[in-house]
């Protein structure tokens, strides 16, 4: 197929065919991140089966999450929701003594209009333990939206930061982001001088759930640039949530946290730093440089550090350079991963993505476009809510070396001779920062190596045997 080189990114939107994990799967990693929390999923038996089986934790292991199973009487509101919720929460406090209880509302609670938001404040005042309500249900486009919803709810519980002396706010120095968020305050000429002249940078809060070992890396990288981090959302301890206010700068580490970003700006009046996400050495460098530029600090040593990482990846790059990939769309990590793979010398035919907030990912999209120009390759087509049937026809035509897909499509595609890699693996793998770039490449190289082995099974031919041959 002849591919025309496009000078700009092409965006399309199809009918959408969603085969993804339920967003309540966010409980799997958030209950481990917020160590003093307890997650209560309010849903049906199906939600319970999913929570127990797909999350890989048996009931006798006593994890810090549980199911509140809805009954038939809950549908016509014949049962007392408040009384039953109170009984469950008192039992949770008695057995686990959490600092916070997080209610996860499912599809069913949305359909029957269960008033979790109305029950929670009254019950919280009675039992004396904070109750956070998050609607992480299967009506969303991608399972990663579960974390986004929970973090957006947690931001409302962060303490209010007192204004500095004089009460003057420090508007954001991000002109690109201002174009997308018209409700942000206008730029102030004196801010840069104020920031540069101060010995300590303004409060900076990072949001996004990363393992502790991975979260330490961006913190230490910013510390090298003399930038102190005021806190993370979420924190390992609920009572250690950072203070928020109009003088606080916030920056995300994952591309699927647009609700959290909007909540931080509109509700808590924080100043959002729009930067590419720290995935891959190129993204990590751009992320740090953008934060430094907002604070009026000249980044030091990042070019040499990035080059050192690329040099250490040379053996991996030799195995992927010249290969082609196709993203079917399973979580909003696709844009960042595609940008990194293009920088590695790969060709990306199509980036399918379940949904995309162009405002929140503006810096990443701009970075992707510049990366394609620098590498002198065609701009990939970005398809939001892709139709899987149409994608399959395009895959047959393009013949990519590797397809990133959800778990529902992996085996059927493999049986038709299309090499696949589960998209969900990148959600749980350590892919952020300079040192974890090789983990991304390892995930890609493995299926490329296994491709020849699968062909030996003759999966490319669907053979129909005659019934008489069994006799």
Curated annotation (Swiss-Prot):
Pfam family, one: Oxidored_nitro
The EC number(s) this enzyme carries: 1.3.7.7
Co-factor requirement: [4Fe-4S] cluster
Protein name: Light-independent protochlorophyllide reductase subunit N
Top-level taxon: Eukaryota
Oligomeric form and interacting partners: Protochlorophyllide reductase is composed of three subunits; ChlL, ChlN and ChlB. Forms a heterotetramer of two ChlB and two ChlN subunits.
GO CC terms of this entry: chloroplast
Molecular function via GO: 4 iron, 4 sulfur cluster binding; ATP binding; metal ion binding; oxidoreductase activity, acting on iron-sulfur proteins as donors; oxidoreductase activity, acting on the CH-CH group of donors, iron-sulfur protein as acceptor
Cofactor mode of binding and number, as noted: Binds 1 [4Fe-4S] cluster per heterodimer. The cluster is bound at the heterodimer interface by residues from both subunits.
Its job: Component of the dark-operative protochlorophyllide reductase (DPOR) that uses Mg-ATP and reduced ferredoxin to reduce ring D of protochlorophyllide (Pchlide) to form chlorophyllide a (Chlide). This reaction is light-independent. The NB-protein (ChlN-ChlB) is the catalytic component of the complex.
Compartments, record wording: Plastid, Chloroplast
Classification lineage: Eukaryota, Viridiplantae, Streptophyta, Embryophyta, Tracheophyta
Residues where [4Fe-4S] cluster binds: 22, 47, 107
UniProt record similarity statement: Belongs to the BchN/ChlN family.
Keywords of this entry: 4Fe-4S, ATP-binding, Chlorophyll biosynthesis, Chloroplast, Iron, Iron-sulfur, Metal-binding, Nucleotide-binding, Oxidoreductase, Photosynthesis, Plastid
């Amino acid at each position: 197929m002849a591919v025309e080189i496009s000078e700009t990114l092409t965006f399309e939107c199809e009918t959408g065919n969603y085969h993804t994990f339920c967003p309540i799967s966010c409980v799997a990693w958030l209950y481990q991140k917020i160590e003093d929390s307890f997650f209560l999923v309010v849903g049906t038996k199906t939600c319970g089966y999913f929570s127990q089986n797909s999350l890989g934790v048996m009931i006798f292991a006593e994890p810090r999450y549980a199911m509140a199973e809805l009954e038939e009487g809950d549908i016509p509101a014949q049962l007392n929701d408040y009384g039953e919720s109170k009984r469950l929460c008192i039992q949770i406090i008695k057995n686990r003594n959490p600092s916070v209880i997080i209610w996860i509302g499912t599809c069913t609670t949305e359909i029957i209009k269960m008033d979790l938001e109305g029950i929670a404040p009254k019950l919280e005042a009675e039992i004396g333990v904070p109750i956070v309500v998050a609607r992480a249900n299967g009506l969303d486009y991608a399972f990663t939206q579960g974390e986004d919803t929970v973090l957006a709810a947690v931001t409302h519980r962060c303490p209010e930061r007192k204004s500095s002396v004089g009460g003057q706010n420090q508007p954001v120095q991000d002109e690109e982001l201002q174009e997308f968020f018209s409700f942000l305050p206008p730029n102030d000429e004196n801010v840069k001088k104020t920031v540069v002249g101060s010995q300590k940078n303004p409060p900076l809060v990072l949001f996004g759930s990363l393992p502790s070992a991975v979260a330490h890396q961006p913190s230490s990288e910013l510390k090298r640039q003399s930038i102190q981090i005021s806190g993370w959302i979420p924190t390992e301890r609920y009572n250690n949530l950072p203070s928020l206010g109009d003088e606080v700068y916030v920056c995300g580490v994952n591309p699927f946290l647009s609700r959290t970003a909007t909540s931080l700006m509109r509700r808590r009046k924080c100043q959002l730093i729009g930067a590419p996400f720290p995935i891959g050495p190129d993204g990590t460098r751009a992320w740090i440089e953008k934060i430094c530029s907002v604070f009026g600090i000249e980044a030091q040593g990042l070019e040499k550090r990035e080059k050192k990482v690329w040099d250490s990846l040379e053996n991996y790059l030799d195995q992927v350079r010249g290969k082609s990939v196709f993203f079917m769309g399973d979580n909003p990590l696709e844009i960042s991963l595609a940008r990194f793979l293009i920088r590695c010398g790969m060709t990306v035919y199509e980036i399918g993505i379940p949904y995309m907030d162009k405002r929140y990912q503006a810096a990443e999209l701009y970075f992707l476009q510049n990366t394609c120009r620098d590498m002198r390759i065609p701009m990939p087509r970005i398809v939001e809510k892709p139709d899987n049937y149409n994608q399959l026809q395009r895959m047959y035509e393009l013949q990519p070396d590797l397809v990133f897909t959800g778990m529902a499509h992996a085996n059927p595609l493999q049986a038709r001779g299309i090499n696949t890699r589960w998209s969900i693996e990148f959600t749980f793998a350590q892919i952020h920062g300079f040192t974890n770039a090789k983990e991304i490449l390892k995930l890609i190289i493995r299926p490329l190596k296994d491709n020849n082995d699968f062909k030996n099974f003759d999966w490319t031919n669907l053979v129909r045997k005659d019934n008489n041959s069994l006799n």
